Amino acid sequence: MFGFGKAKLFQTHQTLLYQCMHFGEFALGLAQESADEDQIEFWETKLARITKLRDASLRKNGILDKEDGYFLDALREKCEEVFYKTELSKQQSFDDTFIPDGGWEDHFEDIRSNF
């Protein structure tokens, strides 16, 4: 389906989308529990953009443009930073927490089937 470079880019972008989306939902829940309006607005805005990027990626064989890839990479760094300030981080790592139930290969295959 892809050359090696495109396959790696596909996996990287889809991993970033998944982790940022699921962490954003987690962080939004924390913000809502503490009634932190600034954080609620921040995560709602980020989740809306991630959703748009996810939908756009499905129209482009799972690959995003360079700027969107940079955005997700920077957002993932922010997500990790916030995650490691939570109690959950004492139990497991960011990567071990935000992983699809069926594993990455099944997740990637599900995405490919949506093209």
Over which residues does each language-model region extend?
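Short, aromatic- and cysteine-enriched interfacial helices/patches
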Residues: 1-8, 63, 113-115
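Short terminal alpha-helical segments
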Residues: 2-38
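Compositionally biased, low-complexity segments enriched in small residues
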Residues: 8-11, 42, 56-57, 74
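Charged, low-complexity interaction regions
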Residues: 26-41, 58-66, 88-95
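Composition-driven detection of intrinsically disordered, low-complexity segments
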Residues: 46-51, 110
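Amphipathic alpha-helical interaction surfaces
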Residues: 49-60, 78-81, 85
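Amphipathic alpha-helical binding modules
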Residues: 69-115
